[in-house]
Amino acid sequence: MNAELKIARPLRGEVRPRSAVSGGVGLVGIVGLLAWVVVARIYGFSGPRASLCAVAACAAPMLVWSVLVDKVHLSPSNGIDWHSAPRPLPQSADTSFVKLAGLWATWAAIAFLYCMGRWYWQEPYLFSMRMFALAAVPLVVASIPYLLWMDRRLKEPRDGAWHLGCLLLGRPFQREMVYEHLRCWTIKGFFLAFMLAIVPGNWFGVVAPTTAEISTNIVRLTQWLIVAMFMFDTTFATVGYVFTMKPLDAHIRSANPYAAGWMAALICYPPFVMMGGNGPLNYRYATLGEDGWGHWFGGHPALLVAWGAVLVALTAIYAWATVAFGPRFSNLTHRGILTHGPYSWTKHPAYLSKNVFWWLSTLPFFVTTGNINDSIRNTFVLCVVNGVYYWRARTEERHLMADPAYRDYAAWAAEHAPITRLLTRLGRMVPRRSAQIAIAAE
């Protein structure tokens, strides 16, 4: 009997760990966004304001689903005590006002850095700056009742903002809590400005083209579908950066504390990006960019269809990796461990699909100069770019490994996620093969 029970009980690592986000929340976000895309294409709503409505159309159903279906506000991980009587307001008010001092100082510092960064006053960032300016006063006003209400319910209201407020007011504080607070808000301030800036462009690329323009040929259709996938990606990502809130259990648990992780991430985004223009990692020199495949395979219709389908599939996986987060997407942070969707295939679906997409779309070895040196150089540089994303993945894992939930997921993925399992086995074979060669050489 005992033996039968042991056989029936799943071994540790055989069952996929539970995902911190449900599959349903991303699906309802897709439905809301798709509905607005249909309306916008009918009425020609292709401008920046319509793109903001797209963010709202994506966010609203996800927030409703999160609260009414997933009941994330009741999750123990958000630190809110709904069962006990709230603290008396006079008892929690001092904590709230100290926290407000820290929070407002943080926002003021971010605004100052926006003013100092010249690139923020050029396109496409001007849209973000205008939106932040419009939101500033309402946000400051709304933060007062929000914190007064939240601090009466939080099990531990003295977070990083409170410790920063104590620092500013000359009270005792914990230095590491201040550092963690500043890391979280640096990430949010940097990436929200970028994501919001590129939302209108992707939105225009999806809504503005007519059906006749889209259906001109397979290359044009593929290009439109790829832009649509990126529109989904940036819209969901923007929602994620906006709604870092504890009542939604979408707060930041921790920000990556490693300098290597920040360096690997920041060189992939402006103004630090090294892959574009005259950057040292520009692998597109003398190519036709990400539309190169359409040129080089132009005389082969069947190949164009097959190649375009693969490119759309890769971009869809990339977008899916963001959609799976629901309202929690964020770079360089831990906001809950995902194990469903494309994360059941590999630990890094976005990086993998993106890098394969660059190879297949750009074809860096095909150059217009006819110079073999340019082909070799582009190929080598794209390999280096792949290495940068491998570096990003490893630094992210180093950060997330502090959470037992991620360690369980990583152990499961190594044996059961198809792509991760394959790569893990290949990795195990390399040193073994090297050892065999060394023994043979002896």
Question: What is each PLM-predicted segment?
Answer:
Residues 2-332, 336, 360-442:
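Membrane-anchoring alpha-helices and their flanking helix-loop junctions
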Residues 335-343, 352:
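Alpha-helical membrane-protein architecture signal
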Residues 348:
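Short, conserved phosphate/pyrophosphate- and ester-handling motifs at nucleotide-, phospho-/glycolipid
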Residues 354-356:
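Transmembrane-embedded, aromatic-rich helix segments that form part
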